[in-house]
Amino acid sequence: MDTETLKKNLQEKMEKALKVLDHELKGLRTGRASVNLLDSVIVEAYGSKIPLSQVASISTPDARTINVQVWDKSMVSLVEKGITIANLGLTPATDGQLIRLPIPILTEERRKELVKLAHKYGEDTKISLRNIRRDGNEELKKLEKNNILTKDEHHSLSEQVQKLTNDYSNKVDSAIKQKEQEIMTV
């Protein structure tokens, strides 16, 4: 493996870790209605587990309500069950094939819990970044050991890997800070 491919692979892995964090943060409730809140809802139907978005259309008519329009009338109770099982703290109110999910106002205590959870997600992502960095550095050591890299090249590339890790770590910090502000805004 050449060094350019190695750097590209490390960057792709770090980008994936950042996307996972972004997806996890979108799932945190901020007190505002967002269709992303229901991304984790799975409905057991037709003998398999199906994402909610494949059995209903989801909309946000206002900042405090999510509407779930179920396409198949026989699925309404299964969709309700899926929303309840997802443990999002939302109480479904059914009206025919329309399920309304009023978004409760977040208490100060709940906001602090969500901020802690966001920080945990951030720390988990940073651990992933450090593991990716470690793997990259081990690969560089192998290349040096096999006389493909000189000691100076190894040192220079290690610094580049560290800089890449620092850049992504800063992106994690800024994503967490932004989410924290979003959560704490009343």
Curated annotation (Swiss-Prot):
One Gene Ontology term, aspect cellular component: cytosol
Keywords: Cytoplasm, Protein biosynthesis
Gene Ontology BP, a term: cytoplasmic translational termination
GO molecular function, a single term: ribosomal large subunit binding
Principal cellular location given in the protein's record: cytoplasm
Subcellular localization, as worded in the UniProt entry: Cytoplasm
Pfam family, any one: RRF
Function: Responsible for the release of ribosomes from messenger RNA at the termination of protein biosynthesis. May increase the efficiency of translation by recycling ribosomes from one round of translation to another.
Family the entry assigns: Belongs to the RRF family.
Name listed for the protein in its UniProt record: Ribosome-recycling factor
Provenance organism: Rickettsia canadensis (strain McKiel)
Gene name tied to this protein: frr
